[in-house]
């Protein structure tokens, strides 16, 4: 299965699909609502 490239918006249901980590402005999966509204993007492995 392919992973999602860095910069791809990641959500709570697919944050494990990032090639690296699902990063939010306040840290990885910092606040559930940030993930839900699309503020988080795939980035380098934390």
Swiss-Prot record:
GO terms for molecular function: toxin activity. Residues 31-33 are annotated as: Keys region for toxin activity. The keyword Disulfide bond applies. The presence of a 'disulfide through disulfide knot' structurally defines this protein as a knottin. Belongs to the neurotoxin 16 (SFI) family. Insecticidal toxin. It inhibits insect voltage-gated sodium channels (Nav) by partially blocking the channel pore in DUM neurons from the American cockroach, not by acting as a gating modifier. The inhibition is only partially reversible after prolonged washout. In vivo, the toxin causes flaccid paralysis followed by death when injected into Heliothis virescens larvae. It also causes uncoordinated movements followed by full paralysis to sheep blowflies (Lucilia cuprina). This is Mu-segestritoxin-Sf1g. It comes from Segestria florentina (Tube-web spider).
């Amino acid at each position: 299965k392919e992973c999602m490239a860095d910069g791809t918006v990641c959500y709570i249901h697919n944050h494990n699909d990032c090639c690296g980590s699902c990063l939010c402005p306040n840290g990885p999966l910092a606040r559930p609502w940030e993930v839900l509204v699309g503020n988080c993007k795939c980035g380098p492995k934390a």
